[in-house]
Design a protein with these regions (language model features):
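Catalytic active-site module of serine/aspartate enzymes centered on a nucleophile-bearing elbow/loop
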Residues: 216-220, 224-259
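Short, conserved loop/helix-junction motifs that constitute active-site signature segments
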Residues: 192-196, 220-223
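Alpha/beta-hydrolase-fold enzymes
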Residues: 70-156
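Gly/Pro-rich cap/lid or specificity-loop segments adjacent to the active site
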Residues: 1-59, 65, 69-81, 86-91, ...
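Active-site nucleophile elbow and catalytic-triad environment of alpha/beta-hydrolase enzymes
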Residues: 153, 168-191
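Short beta-strand/loop motif that positions the catalytic acidic residue
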Residues: 195, 201-203
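Detector for conserved single-position "signature" residues within domains
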Residues: 78, 96-103, 121, 202, ...
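Conserved alpha/beta-hydrolase "acid-adjacent" motif
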Residues: 184, 208-214
Length: 259
């Protein structure tokens, strides 16, 4: 995915598009690049399945809209086809946490803005899992002993990333909307109804990034959809494989879907 530090990203692109000057990339841009790769480089004529978690799920749904005759089956795990207003505000909070560090210097930093990155990690720690996950102390299943340990865990994770890369990814996430695909004039309902692939739509019951009500409404608009809600207290992280129960549920549903 663009901006992840491996593909073209603010951290590895030369001037004039390096750092904070990196252009806004859409989910659709990522999917278009993937399509060109598999068709022009590998000569693939049709894809049997696309599977994605979180921003990968955003891409999976976009594959179905952008290339309706190219993909047979789509699995979207804990992700949406549209980023709704509350999610956009939440992401702005994450971005603001990083930018509040004086050493961020509008993205022109000489060393990682560690204070801002840690603040971003603390932000994510409050959103990644459900309230009940914290109340029941399920963090102990990750060999963590307290909510403070969870914050430290997420801070250390965020510190492994480049700040401009994270902000660029957040902007991509903020602006996601399959309705912006050419031909749909911003109408995401129409875009979802155009999907011809079979779709396994798997939201997490307690996801605080992608709210279950919005996702079930999205699923209802897709003609060939199979909605399977992950019955988990792990929030968004239910799709990341940390819980063996969640991983087993997801694996079994995908196996059944691909029969």
């Amino acid at each position: 995915m663009f901006q992840n530090g491996l593909s073209s990203s603010p951290s590895n692109t030369t001037e004039p598009f390096s750092g904070p000057n990196f252009p806004l990339i859409s989910i659709r841009d990522n999917v278009k690049a993937g399509y060109k790769l598999v068709t022009e480089v590998f000569g693939v004529k049709r894809i049997y399945g696309v599977v994605g978690f979180s921003m990968g799920a955003q891409q999976a749904f976009q594959w179905g809209v952008s290339y309706p005759n190219f993909v047979e089956k789509i699995v979207g795990i804990a992700g949406s086809a549209v980023e709704y207003p509350h999610g956009q505000v939440r992401l702005e909070g994450f971005i603001a946490a990083i930018q509040a560090d004086n050493s961020f210097n509008e993205g022109n930093y000489n060393s990682p803005p560690e204070i801002g990155l840690r603040a971003g990690g603390a932000h994510w720690a409050s959103w990644g899992w459900s309230q009940e996950w914290y109340r029941q102390g399920l963090y102990k299943e990750m060999e963590l002993n307290s909510p403070s340990d969870v914050i430290n865990w997420f801070e250390e994770f965020v510190l492994t990333w480049d700040a401009n890369n994270l902000i660029a990814l957040a902007r991509t996430w903020q602006n996601n909307n399959v309705g912006n695909t050419p031909g749909f004039n911003g109408d995401y309902s129409k875009a979802l109804k155009s999907i011809k692939a079979e779709v396994l739509y798997m939201p997490s019951e307690t996801d605080m990034y992608f709210h279950i009500e919005a996702l079930t409404q999205e699923a209802e608009k897709i003609p060939g959809v199979k909605l399977r809600i992950i019955p988990s207290l792990w929030g968004h992280i239910a799709g990341a494989g940390f819980s063996s129960d969640d991983a087993e549920f997801i694996d079994q549903e995908i196996k059944e879907f691909y029969k």
